[in-house]
Amino acid sequence: MQFTIASLIATAVLGLQMASAAPHAPGSSNAAIISQAQEQNTCGNAHLSCCESTDNSVSLTQEEEEGLLHLLGGTSSVLSDGLLGKYSGCSSLASVEGILGAGGNQGLVSGQCNNHVACCDAGDNELVGFLEPGVAVLKPNSDGIQNGLANVAVPCVPVQVL
């Protein structure tokens, strides 16, 4: 069971690392326009948010270090790269006036958020227990849907805006 969960998380981490390493097209910049549909494709049920700061100095107990996070490389890779960092001061970009137009027609212009862009939990999930220290199990959302084999309670996950 631990190997299955570890391999799923490792695949997700690898996907995020590959996406962030993707080269830009000639003449492109970080001034892309993100539509509401792209936000939905990027974040799913979470909200695209702008966070003021992140704290990557997350420390693990000895028990946590020997668990699932240790299988993923411990604090030397997963946590130090900011993939599970603690974000603070996050506000939904959809709630900032003028960024998302009515019906999503206007789009989100990169540069409106000069800090950290992340997909943050929509808040409709409920923590029901722990698989092991540091890995939480979530109750299905209000629609009774639980996506994935094991859902992990991570409030915000960074997004690479191209």
Curated annotation (Swiss-Prot):
Induction: Expressed after 12 to 24 hours post induction of asexual development, which correlates with the development of metulae and phialides. Not expressed in hyphae and strongly induced during development. Residues 1-21 form the signal peptide. InterPro entries: Hydrophobin (IPR001338). GO terms for cellular component: extracellular region; fungal-type cell wall. Disulfide bonds join 43-119, 50-113, 51-90, 120-156. Belongs to the fungal hydrophobin family. Keywords: Conidiation, Disulfide bond, Secreted, Signal, Sporulation. This is Class I hydrophobin dewC. Self-assembles to form functional amyloid fibrils called rodlets. Self-assembly into fibrillar rodlets occurs spontaneously at hydrophobic:hydrophilic interfaces and the rodlets further associate laterally to form amphipathic monolayers. GO terms for molecular function: structural constituent of cell wall. It is found in: Secreted; Spore wall. It comes from the Eukaryota. Aerial growth, conidiation, and dispersal of filamentous fungi in the environment rely upon a capability of their secreting small amphipathic proteins called hydrophobins (HPBs) with low sequence identity. Class I can self-assemble into an outermost layer of rodlet bundles on aerial cell surfaces, conferring cellular hydrophobicity that supports fungal growth, development and dispersal; whereas Class II form highly ordered films at water-air interfaces through intermolecular interactions but contribute nothing to the rodlet structure. The keyword Secreted applies. It comes from Emericella nidulans (strain FGSC A4 / ATCC 38163 / CBS 112.46 / NRRL 194 / M139).
